């Protein structure tokens, strides 16, 4: 049976189906196509496709094949669920990285990431183009506008704190390497955002925000987010596997590779999947 692969980690209304599938020890083989074009030329199905073999006489781990860019990785025989995980990690190379990270038993970033619509403002919100005294600067899908504090429906305590805004949607392409996340930028005191963004934080000051952004820029961090990403939506759930670091200083990939014991083979996998994140932040563009 060939089906969209969104059920691996997301998909509206698929929680019960995913739970049943991942606890079914009769799933003997899974063939995964992260990019549907590798199976059906010219067809784009967000999150890719998969087909599987269910064998009532089989009770045990599943043999997983990944088809990407004309090449097949696998089979790797492994459990469908890793410890502490309620979704399927689709990349065989990613399982060893995940296992190394969870050995550290660190709190993860979904604790400090907002749900959608962090200030209660929808994507259709458009404030005034010129600021009046006491207005809040609102980052929205057409740039920047201004609103009275009384017009901000929720989480008003975040307005006057340092935080990070990051787009709620990223590139819709399933081709790799991929950025996975949109570019983050600092939300200084006096700012809010529409549903176009989600919020990370709050943080003590601007320096801490800058250090968090160095972490988001790393390929390692975005690889961990990728394990939960099956559509272009970048929700709070993507940060479930991303450990919180010591943000009194910045981070680089080399620092993280050393901390978690990432091998050269795993680094090659990361480089093949994740694009560098470079360029001017949106905040800089609007200053």
Tell me the role of every PLM-derived stretch.
Residues 8-9, 172-175, 277:
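Flexible loop/turn segments at secondary-structure boundaries
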Residues 268-287:
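Short, amphipathic C-terminal "tail helix"
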Residues 37-266:
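C-terminal substrate-recognition regions of SAM-dependent nucleic acid methyltransferases
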Residues 1-38, 50-52, 212:
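Conserved Class I SAM-dependent methyltransferase catalytic core
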Residues 4, 57, 272:
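Surface loops and adjacent helix of pleckstrin homology
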């Amino acid at each position: 049976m060939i089906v969209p692969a969104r059920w691996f980690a997301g998909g509206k209304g698929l929680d019960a189906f995913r739970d049943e599938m991942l606890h079914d020890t009769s799933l003997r083989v899974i063939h995964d196509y992260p990019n549907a074009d590798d199976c059906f030329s010219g067809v784009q199905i967000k999150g890719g496709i998969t087909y599987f073999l269910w064998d009532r006489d089989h009770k045990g781990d599943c043999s997983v094949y990944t088809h990407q860019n004309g090449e097949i990785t696998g089979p790797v025989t492994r459990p469908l669920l890793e410890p502490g995980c309620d979704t399927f990690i689709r990349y065989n190379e990613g399982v060893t990285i995940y296992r190394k990270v969870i050995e550290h038993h660190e709190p993860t970033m979904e604790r400090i990431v907002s749900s959608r619509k962090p200030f209660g403002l929808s994507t259709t919100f458009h404030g005034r183009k010129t600021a009046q005294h006491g207005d809040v600067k609102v980052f929205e899908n057409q740039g920047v506008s201004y609103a009275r504090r009384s017009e901000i429906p929720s989480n008003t305590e975040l307005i006057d704190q340092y935080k990070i805004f990051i787009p709620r949607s990223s590139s819709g392409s399933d081709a790799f390497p991929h950025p996975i996340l949109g570019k983050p930028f600092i939300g200084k005191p006096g700012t809010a955002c529409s549903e176009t963004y989600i919020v990370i934080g709050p943080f003590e000051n601007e320096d801490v925000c800058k250090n968090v952004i160095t972490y988001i820029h790393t390929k390692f961090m975005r690889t961990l987010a990728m394990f939960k990403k099956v559509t272009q939506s970048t929700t709070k759930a993507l940060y479930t596997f991303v450990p919180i670091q010591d943000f009194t200083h910045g981070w680089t990939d080399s620092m993280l590779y050393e901390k978690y014991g990432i091998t050269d083979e795993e680094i090659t996998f990361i480089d093949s999947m994740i694009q560098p994140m470079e360029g001017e932040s949106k905040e800089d563009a609007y200053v």
